UniProtKB/Swiss-Prot annotation:
This is Thymidylate kinase. Its EC number is 2.7.4.9. GO terms for biological process: dTDP biosynthetic process; dTTP biosynthetic process; dUDP biosynthetic process. InterPro entries: P-loop_NTPase, Thymidylate_kin-like_dom, Thymidylate_kinase. Keywords: ATP-binding, Kinase, Nucleotide biosynthesis, Nucleotide-binding, Transferase. Belongs to the thymidylate kinase family. GO terms for cellular component: cytoplasm; cytosol.
Length: 227
């Protein structure tokens, strides 16, 4: 039994500063939704394509300017939207993104680029139905990065992450939900799961074409909340 959300699917973006637990939540949430019968596409930005690979290399070396990073991010995102995000949404699937355009606004905005211009440059990108913002104090995020054995890159300084956190907090986007990421991973998953179930329930309430099977699938999803 699956949940069909055509037309439009459901786009979930998971955002937050480095060390907030975005990748952990994205994977756990995708697994939980799939087990409940949802069709899920899990992806990330930057992608593993040529532009995304170049961006990750830049993050490690710090050799690109903020504007050069924006140019690569936009190329990567356009390819991502056209090849994966838009087709999956058209099929009525749930798309979960580990970072999306709000990260560009926060990180390149923290580097001094105008926030309005960064948002406008992403007008082509579908807006997320749900923006799950994992909020975390930067010292905690940096401690987590070191605990997993990674060396912080040039983005991952306390001052820069403070600026990024402030921009994330100030972003006014529909579907934004702030989640306390200082809690343990299970607690964060419970918070995110509740938000997603509520969004799916709203979609079924306003739709007139949903089948009994879809409603039963939603009940299964609701019952499958993490312990």
């Amino acid at each position: 039994m699956t949940i069909e959300l055509t037309p439009g699917g459901l786009l979930i973006a998971i955002e937050g500063i480095d060390g907030a637990g975005k990748t952990t939540l994205a994977r756990s949430l995708a697994t939980l939704l799939e087990q409940a019968g949802a069709r899920v596409v899990l992806s990330k930005e930057p992608t593993n394509g040529p532009w995304g690979t170049q961006l990750r290399q830049s993050a490690a070396t710090g050799r690109l300017s903020a504007q050069d990073e924006v140019d690569l991010l936009l190329r990567d995102r356009r390819e991502h939207v056209e090849a994966l995000i838009a087709p999956a949404l058209a099929r009525g699937e749930i798309v979960i993104l580990d970072r999306y355009f709000p990260s560009m606004v926060a990180y390149q905005g923290a580097a001094g680029l105008p926030l309005d211009a960064l948002l406008a440059a992403n007008d082509f990108a579908p807006r997320p139905d749900l923006l799950l913002l994992l909020d975390l104090p930067p010292p905690t995020g940096l401690a987590r990065i070191r605990a997993r054995g990674d060396a912080p890159n040039h983005f991952e300084t306390q001052d820069n992450l403070e600026r990024c956190r402030a921009i994330f907090a100030a972003l006014q986007l529909p579907g934004k939900h702030v989640i306390d990421a200082s809690a343990d991973a299970d607690s964060v998953l419970r918070q995110a799961h509740a938000v997603v179930v509520a969004a799916l329930a709203d979609r079924l309430r306003v739709g007139a074409t949903h089948t009994d099977a879809e409603k039963a699938a939603l009940e299964l999803l609701s019952a499958g909340r993490p312990a």
